[in-house]
Amino acid sequence: MFSRARPRKLDTEDELYDEALRALMRRAHSVHEMKQKLARRTDNELLVRVVMARLKENGQLDDERYAQQFTRNRTQSRKQGKFRIARDLRARGVADNQINAAIEDAAATTDTVAMVRQRIERKMRACRGEMDERKIASIYGSLLRAGFPSDVIRKELKNLTREEVPETDAE
């Protein structure tokens, strides 16, 4: 019914720059993401480099700031752990040193143990019946995928379920 037409190729620096600004108004982008987005809109690699340099020079594109905002959002809103956040930032092309700095800053204001405990309690409320090994393993896997350290997960599961949680290193 609806066909998604290909966006037309942009030929001038101003058109490409305006497209970049529209994308940045919708959400923040890493340098890598923006470069990919602009490259899809033009065949001129030089034009992409010029627009990228202009965005960086004007302070509209900064991976360090992006990593800080992304990390803060993921820890506060989505309650995700540092491993998941780092993986997602790497997928967005952010450098490891910027990722580590952002995670360290967020760690100063985030209580990982409390976040793990809250997620376990929420999962336990959702589980019907008695907590068996399968349900505990499911919660454990869910928290690992959310990016929390396995030792913190095991400790909190043990505290909240008063059962022995198997020792596995699946970080």
Regions found by a protein language model. Give the residues of each.
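An alpha-helical, amphipathic repeat domain used for nucleic-acid recognition
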Residues: 1-171
